[in-house]
Each structure stands twice: as C-alpha cells, then as structure tokens.
C-alpha cells in the first residue's frame, strides 16, 4: 500500500500551507498529490504549479469535471501536464452533480454513465495520438456536414498510457469504473462496507475479462492523531456533514445515498434535514462517531497502525490522506507519522 495526499480545493484559505505539504509529501516519498475542483479554482493550474515545485511525486486531478471540459481539451491538458511534469500526471475524472453541471457549466446532467463512457473513449484515443473520430450519443467528432476533420494530438505524452481514474459512488458508476478506468477515487471508504460496495467494481472488471491486479483503489481518508478519540473525530464533523448533508439537492446527493447504503439511513436523513435548514451545528452533531471512525484514521499511531490492515485487506492500494486538523506544523507531523505508521505496519509497497 502506498500513500497519497489530497489537498482538496484551492482557495479554501490554506493555499500556502498546501504547497508546503506537497513539498513535504514529495520529500517523504508519497506517491501522489491530488487537487480538486468544483466551481472555484481549477485543478489543472494548481497541479501545474505543484509539479513545478516538486521532483518525484505524481500529481493527479481528483477530479477534472467532465461537464467542464470537452474530451479533446482534457486530453490536451493531460498530455501537457504529463510532459511538463516528466511523466508524473494521473488523470482523475468525474461527472460532478446536477447542480454544478447544469448551474455552473450549463450541461444537462442526463445519462452520466453514457457520457462518461464516451468521454473516456475519446480521451484515450486522443492520448494514443490516433486521429480522433467518434460517433456517440453525446459526442460526435468531427461534426458532420461541416469543415471539421479528424485531428491528431500534436503533443507527445511522456508515457504511452496516462492512467485514468474515475470518482464513482453509485453501483452502476462503480461497475463502469471497473470496465474502463485504471483506478477508482473513493470517498467515505469503509473497510467494513467495502466488500459489498466494491462488488460492482469487481463485476465490471470481470465483465471485460480483467482482474483487480494492477487496478488502483484510492480512497481519500481523513487522518487525525491523538489520544482522545472523540476530540480526534470533532474536526471531521464539518467535512462529513457538508458532504452527507449539503452536497447536491435533497433528491440527488450521492454522498447521502452512500451513507444510507452503509447502514446510516436514519442519521443521513437527519444530517441532511439539519444542514438544509442551515442548522450546521446540529448537522455536525448528528454525524455518528461510528461513521467517522469507519471512514477515517483517528487515534494514537498504534491504533491507526492496527486499522491500516483493514484498509489493505479491503483492497486499498493507495491510501490518500487528508489533513483537516491542526496548524501547518501539526499537519506536517501527520504526514511524517503516517509514513512511520505504514512502515511499522509492514504494509508499505
């Protein structure tokens, strides 16, 4: 199992700290640092900046929003980032959600699975430097009855295959991820629920004659070290309440649906009700400690070390940590402690 670092969204108030953390992760031998985007900063610019100031660590999008870029533009960006970084780019993609897709990008959120399948196919064709022609439900290249012609990407990526990851939560999207992606970007990953939640992913691999060998399972896992478990969990309540309660509409919140599938249906409804009523403190208080404990790494280094085996046994290959607690020096220490803990566990690869 390898380690990664998720910097989250740029512009959240800790940007200078994130650069320091990325450099420290690079020094410590972390395998990848990820950047996110929603409707603020774009991940590509952030990753270019990080890549220019690091040497070994991979840089990855978690994720580029599919409705925000044409497939050709994504291929151009991926090839450029891979070239500038010396072959260190990982392309993470996601469909976002209805509110952002339709409200920010002006793209209807219909048939997201079909759109994703077509999108990835075009990106792969472009990155392989084939002439890009495609006829699908959402994308047709070149457009018919016009002057357009099939073109070939002029940039030569450093690698023959830039790895493509998909952020997936629902069962059908998980199955698609297994079929067409090289890795899965997970959130609220619980080892206790992994066998059931990952079954569609494994089925997707099997349906196209593939196994899980070489497939990268990459959950983002918040990490807080300390002796008091309740105190360690408290900084993660806002993060959990925001996603379970406030990401998306009442009818279309994929994180809320995931919490329900994990056995927290009553609590997920309460969190959403309170969050949408702007009772944010109440929403945070409604997040069960057990949910936080299952989906994060909290407690003493020894407790975290023991917990790592559950993640490894569940199939995690790259454990991407998020440091949501403490000042900069404490977060740097968290990066170092995770390296020590992983090595002590005997699970490092």
Residue ranges of predicted features:
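Active-site-adjacent structural elements that line small-molecule/cofactor binding pockets in enzymes
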Residues: 1-349
